Amino acid sequence: MKVICGSVFLFSLFFQVVLGDYFSSSSGNPNLRTTKVYTVVSGTHLATAESTVSKTITTTKGLPTNAYYNCVPSKYIQSDIPMCAPNQGDRWVKGRKYKVSWDPLYFGVDNLLMVVSYLNDSGLIAATKKVQNSKGEIMLKANKGWLHDDSFQNVTIDLVTISENNMTLLTGPRILLAKDLDSATAAAENAAFYGPRRNIKAAIAVPSVILGLILVALVYYAYRKDTWKIYMAKIRIRRSAPGYGVRRSRRQRMQSRPVAYTSLPADAHFEDSDDEDYYQSQVKKFH
Protein backbone atom coordinates (compact mmCIF):
# COMPACT_ATOMS: atom_id res chain seq x y z
CA MET A 1 0.00 0.00 0.00
CA LYS A 2 2.87 2.37 0.81
CA VAL A 3 4.43 1.66 -2.56
CA ILE A 4 1.15 2.46 -4.37
CA CYS A 5 0.60 5.68 -2.41
CA GLY A 6 4.16 6.76 -3.12
CA SER A 7 3.74 6.12 -6.85
CA VAL A 8 0.50 8.15 -6.94
CA PHE A 9 2.19 11.03 -5.12
CA LEU A 10 5.16 11.07 -7.53
CA PHE A 11 2.84 10.94 -10.57
CA SER A 12 0.71 13.86 -9.29
CA LEU A 13 3.85 15.87 -8.54
CA PHE A 14 5.19 15.24 -12.06
CA PHE A 15 1.81 16.22 -13.58
CA GLN A 16 1.76 19.50 -11.64
CA VAL A 17 5.32 20.35 -12.65
CA VAL A 18 4.64 19.74 -16.35
CA LEU A 19 1.40 21.76 -16.38
CA GLY A 20 2.94 24.53 -14.35
CA ASP A 21 5.84 24.78 -16.81
CA TYR A 22 3.46 25.12 -19.76
CA PHE A 23 0.87 27.51 -18.35
CA SER A 24 3.08 29.71 -16.19
CA SER A 25 3.62 33.00 -18.02
CA SER A 26 2.84 31.18 -21.26
CA SER A 27 6.10 29.18 -20.91
CA GLY A 28 8.67 31.88 -20.67
CA ASN A 29 6.75 34.79 -22.22
CA PRO A 30 6.27 37.90 -20.04
CA ASN A 31 2.96 38.29 -18.23
CA LEU A 32 2.64 41.83 -19.54
CA ARG A 33 2.97 42.73 -23.19
CA THR A 34 3.21 46.27 -24.47
CA THR A 35 1.86 46.85 -27.93
CA LYS A 36 0.57 49.69 -30.05
CA VAL A 37 -3.12 50.45 -30.29
CA TYR A 38 -4.62 50.93 -33.74
CA THR A 39 -7.94 52.48 -34.61
CA VAL A 40 -9.92 51.65 -37.75
CA VAL A 41 -10.09 54.68 -40.03
CA SER A 42 -11.48 53.04 -43.18
CA GLY A 43 -11.82 49.65 -44.76
CA THR A 44 -8.34 49.82 -46.22
CA HIS A 45 -6.20 51.76 -43.73
CA LEU A 46 -5.13 51.70 -40.11
CA ALA A 47 -3.99 54.84 -38.32
CA THR A 48 -1.82 54.52 -35.22
CA ALA A 49 -2.62 56.14 -31.91
CA GLU A 50 0.71 56.90 -30.28
CA SER A 51 0.09 55.13 -27.01
CA THR A 52 0.67 51.74 -25.50
CA VAL A 53 -1.33 49.37 -23.36
CA SER A 54 -0.43 46.42 -21.20
CA LYS A 55 -2.01 43.11 -22.11
CA THR A 56 -2.23 40.30 -19.59
CA ILE A 57 -1.85 36.84 -21.11
CA THR A 58 -4.94 34.76 -20.42
CA THR A 59 -6.34 31.50 -21.67
CA THR A 60 -9.02 31.38 -24.34
CA LYS A 61 -12.63 31.31 -23.24
CA GLY A 62 -14.57 28.12 -23.63
CA LEU A 63 -11.61 25.90 -24.51
CA PRO A 64 -11.81 22.31 -23.25
CA THR A 65 -9.33 21.42 -20.55
CA ASN A 66 -7.86 18.61 -22.67
CA ALA A 67 -7.40 20.74 -25.82
CA TYR A 68 -4.29 19.93 -27.85
CA TYR A 69 -2.58 22.35 -30.23
CA ASN A 70 0.41 22.00 -32.49
CA CYS A 71 1.58 25.56 -31.93
CA VAL A 72 3.20 25.64 -28.49
CA PRO A 73 5.72 28.11 -27.02
CA SER A 74 8.67 25.89 -27.94
CA LYS A 75 7.71 26.30 -31.62
CA TYR A 76 7.15 30.07 -31.70
CA ILE A 77 8.86 31.85 -34.59
CA GLN A 78 10.07 34.35 -31.96
CA SER A 79 9.77 34.29 -28.21
CA ASP A 80 7.51 37.36 -28.27
CA ILE A 81 5.35 36.27 -31.23
CA PRO A 82 2.93 33.43 -30.36
CA MET A 83 2.79 32.19 -33.95
CA CYS A 84 4.35 29.10 -35.52
CA ALA A 85 3.74 29.71 -39.23
CA PRO A 86 4.74 31.32 -41.47
CA ASN A 87 8.37 31.89 -40.55
CA GLN A 88 10.14 35.20 -40.79
CA GLY A 89 11.22 35.91 -44.37
CA ASP A 90 9.13 33.18 -46.02
CA ARG A 91 8.25 33.72 -49.65
CA TRP A 92 4.69 33.35 -50.83
CA VAL A 93 3.52 33.17 -54.42
CA LYS A 94 0.17 34.54 -55.50
CA GLY A 95 -2.58 32.01 -56.01
CA ARG A 96 -1.18 29.44 -53.58
CA LYS A 97 -2.43 28.51 -50.12
CA TYR A 98 -0.24 28.73 -47.03
CA LYS A 99 -0.76 27.79 -43.39
CA VAL A 100 -0.97 30.41 -40.68
CA SER A 101 -0.89 28.98 -37.15
CA TRP A 102 -0.88 30.54 -33.68
CA ASP A 103 -1.14 29.52 -30.03
CA PRO A 104 -4.83 29.86 -29.01
CA LEU A 105 -3.92 29.73 -25.31
CA TYR A 106 -2.06 33.01 -25.65
CA PHE A 107 -5.13 35.11 -26.50
CA GLY A 108 -8.10 35.80 -24.23
CA VAL A 109 -10.81 36.11 -26.88
CA ASP A 110 -13.02 33.78 -28.87
CA ASN A 111 -12.32 35.40 -32.25
CA LEU A 112 -9.32 37.07 -33.84
CA LEU A 113 -8.93 39.37 -36.79
CA MET A 114 -6.13 38.38 -39.14
CA VAL A 115 -4.65 41.35 -40.98
CA VAL A 116 -2.26 41.28 -43.93
CA SER A 117 -0.44 44.63 -43.69
CA TYR A 118 2.03 46.18 -46.10
CA LEU A 119 5.45 46.76 -44.61
CA ASN A 120 5.68 50.47 -45.38
CA ASP A 121 4.61 53.81 -43.96
CA SER A 122 1.33 53.98 -45.85
CA GLY A 123 -0.61 51.92 -43.31
CA LEU A 124 -2.38 50.18 -46.19
CA ILE A 125 -3.99 46.84 -45.44
CA ALA A 126 -3.99 44.06 -48.04
CA ALA A 127 -6.71 41.94 -46.45
CA THR A 128 -8.55 41.19 -43.23
CA LYS A 129 -10.13 37.92 -42.16
CA LYS A 130 -12.08 36.99 -39.04
CA VAL A 131 -10.92 33.66 -37.60
CA GLN A 132 -11.96 31.49 -34.68
CA ASN A 133 -9.21 31.58 -32.09
CA SER A 134 -9.75 28.02 -30.83
CA LYS A 135 -8.90 26.54 -34.26
CA GLY A 136 -5.27 27.58 -33.96
CA GLU A 137 -4.60 27.62 -37.71
CA ILE A 138 -6.08 28.37 -41.12
CA MET A 139 -5.05 28.05 -44.76
CA LEU A 140 -4.65 31.51 -46.29
CA LYS A 141 -4.57 31.98 -50.06
CA ALA A 142 -2.23 34.67 -51.38
CA ASN A 143 -4.43 36.93 -53.48
CA LYS A 144 -2.98 38.56 -56.57
CA GLY A 145 -4.70 41.81 -55.55
CA TRP A 146 -2.26 42.10 -52.66
CA LEU A 147 0.52 42.88 -55.14
CA HIS A 148 -1.06 46.12 -56.40
CA ASP A 149 0.33 45.42 -59.90
CA ASP A 150 3.88 45.01 -58.55
CA SER A 151 6.06 41.92 -58.89
CA PHE A 152 6.90 41.79 -55.16
CA GLN A 153 5.44 43.08 -51.91
CA ASN A 154 6.66 42.86 -48.31
CA VAL A 155 3.77 42.20 -45.96
CA THR A 156 3.24 41.09 -42.37
CA ILE A 157 0.67 38.61 -41.05
CA ASP A 158 -0.77 40.26 -37.95
CA LEU A 159 -3.31 39.10 -35.37
CA VAL A 160 -5.73 41.58 -33.82
CA THR A 161 -7.92 41.35 -30.73
CA ILE A 162 -10.92 43.66 -30.69
CA SER A 163 -11.89 45.43 -27.48
CA GLU A 164 -14.62 48.08 -27.50
CA ASN A 165 -13.64 50.60 -30.20
CA ASN A 166 -9.92 49.81 -30.27
CA MET A 167 -7.88 46.99 -31.74
CA THR A 168 -4.84 45.52 -30.06
CA LEU A 169 -2.53 44.42 -32.85
CA LEU A 170 0.18 41.81 -32.52
CA THR A 171 2.65 42.21 -35.37
CA GLY A 172 3.38 38.84 -36.90
CA PRO A 173 6.03 37.46 -39.25
CA ARG A 174 7.23 39.31 -42.33
CA ILE A 175 6.89 37.55 -45.68
CA LEU A 176 7.79 38.34 -49.28
CA LEU A 177 4.85 38.06 -51.66
CA ALA A 178 5.90 37.30 -55.25
CA LYS A 179 3.90 37.49 -58.45
CA ASP A 180 5.54 34.38 -59.88
CA LEU A 181 8.82 32.48 -59.92
CA ASP A 182 11.25 31.58 -62.65
CA SER A 183 10.81 28.08 -64.06
CA ALA A 184 13.85 26.58 -62.30
CA THR A 185 12.88 27.91 -58.87
CA ALA A 186 9.23 26.92 -59.35
CA ALA A 187 10.24 23.39 -60.39
CA ALA A 188 12.54 23.04 -57.37
CA GLU A 189 9.87 24.24 -54.95
CA ASN A 190 7.21 22.02 -56.51
CA ALA A 191 9.54 19.02 -56.27
CA ALA A 192 10.26 19.80 -52.62
CA PHE A 193 6.58 20.23 -51.76
CA TYR A 194 4.79 17.77 -54.06
CA GLY A 195 7.61 15.33 -54.79
CA PRO A 196 9.35 14.63 -58.12
CA ARG A 197 7.28 15.59 -61.14
CA ARG A 198 6.09 12.62 -63.12
CA ASN A 199 5.55 12.45 -66.88
CA ILE A 200 1.88 11.53 -67.04
CA LYS A 201 1.88 10.91 -70.80
CA ALA A 202 4.81 8.53 -70.57
CA ALA A 203 3.26 6.82 -67.56
CA ILE A 204 0.19 6.07 -69.67
CA ALA A 205 1.83 5.39 -73.04
CA VAL A 206 4.56 2.97 -71.94
CA PRO A 207 2.28 0.49 -70.13
CA SER A 208 -0.20 0.69 -73.02
CA VAL A 209 2.50 -0.24 -75.55
CA ILE A 210 3.74 -3.10 -73.37
CA LEU A 211 0.22 -4.47 -72.91
CA GLY A 212 -0.38 -4.17 -76.66
CA LEU A 213 2.76 -6.19 -77.44
CA ILE A 214 1.77 -8.85 -74.91
CA LEU A 215 -1.69 -9.07 -76.47
CA VAL A 216 -0.25 -9.45 -79.99
CA ALA A 217 2.11 -12.17 -78.75
CA LEU A 218 -0.76 -14.08 -77.13
CA VAL A 219 -2.88 -13.87 -80.28
CA TYR A 220 0.02 -15.05 -82.44
CA TYR A 221 0.74 -17.90 -80.05
CA ALA A 222 -2.89 -19.00 -80.06
CA TYR A 223 -2.99 -18.86 -83.87
CA ARG A 224 0.21 -20.88 -84.22
CA LYS A 225 -1.02 -23.40 -81.67
CA ASP A 226 -4.29 -24.01 -83.54
CA THR A 227 -2.46 -24.20 -86.89
CA TRP A 228 -0.05 -26.78 -85.49
CA LYS A 229 -2.94 -28.87 -84.18
CA ILE A 230 -4.60 -28.84 -87.61
CA TYR A 231 -1.30 -29.80 -89.28
CA MET A 232 -0.73 -32.73 -86.90
CA ALA A 233 -4.31 -33.91 -87.40
CA LYS A 234 -3.76 -34.01 -91.16
CA ILE A 235 -0.61 -36.08 -90.70
CA ARG A 236 -2.49 -38.60 -88.53
CA ILE A 237 -5.22 -38.92 -91.17
CA ARG A 238 -2.64 -39.59 -93.87
CA ARG A 239 -0.91 -42.26 -91.81
CA SER A 240 -4.16 -44.08 -91.07
CA ALA A 241 -5.21 -44.23 -94.78
CA PRO A 242 -4.77 -47.61 -96.66
CA GLY A 243 -1.75 -48.13 -98.88
CA TYR A 244 1.97 -48.04 -98.42
CA GLY A 245 3.03 -46.26 -95.30
CA VAL A 246 6.42 -44.91 -94.53
CA ARG A 247 6.68 -47.00 -91.37
CA ARG A 248 5.00 -50.24 -92.57
CA SER A 249 7.23 -53.26 -93.01
CA ARG A 250 7.29 -55.39 -96.15
CA ARG A 251 5.51 -58.19 -94.34
CA GLN A 252 2.72 -55.81 -93.27
CA ARG A 253 2.40 -54.49 -96.82
CA MET A 254 2.21 -58.04 -98.24
CA GLN A 255 -0.44 -59.06 -95.71
CA SER A 256 -2.62 -56.19 -96.81
CA ARG A 257 -2.72 -57.43 -100.46
CA PRO A 258 -5.75 -59.46 -101.74
CA VAL A 259 -5.60 -63.22 -101.09
CA ALA A 260 -4.39 -65.25 -104.16
CA TYR A 261 -5.20 -68.92 -104.67
CA THR A 262 -2.14 -71.20 -104.49
CA SER A 263 -4.15 -74.38 -105.41
CA LEU A 264 -7.27 -75.12 -107.38
CA PRO A 265 -10.53 -75.33 -105.54
CA ALA A 266 -12.17 -78.73 -105.18
CA ASP A 267 -15.09 -77.87 -107.48
CA ALA A 268 -12.94 -76.70 -110.37
CA HIS A 269 -13.14 -78.76 -113.68
CA PHE A 270 -11.95 -78.55 -117.28
CA GLU A 271 -13.94 -78.55 -120.48
CA ASP A 272 -12.75 -80.86 -123.25
CA SER A 273 -12.52 -79.57 -126.81
CA ASP A 274 -11.31 -81.04 -130.04
CA ASP A 275 -9.83 -77.74 -131.03
CA GLU A 276 -6.33 -77.79 -129.72
CA ASP A 277 -5.88 -74.06 -130.03
CA TYR A 278 -9.02 -73.46 -128.14
CA TYR A 279 -7.96 -76.04 -125.64
CA GLN A 280 -4.68 -74.33 -125.03
CA SER A 281 -6.40 -71.04 -124.38
CA GLN A 282 -9.11 -72.49 -122.20
CA VAL A 283 -7.05 -74.90 -120.17
CA LYS A 284 -8.07 -73.48 -116.88
CA LYS A 285 -11.49 -72.09 -117.29
CA PHE A 286 -13.40 -72.26 -114.08
CA HIS A 287 -17.12 -72.71 -113.54
Swiss-Prot record:
GO biological process, one term: endoplasmic reticulum to Golgi vesicle-mediated transport
Membrane topology designation: Single-pass membrane protein
Ranges per topology, Cytoplasmic: 223-287
Transmembrane region(s): 202-222
Location in the cell: Membrane
Main location: membrane
Transmembrane as UniProt keyword: yes
Superkingdom in the source lineage: Eukaryota
Name of protein: Uncharacterized membrane protein P31B10.04
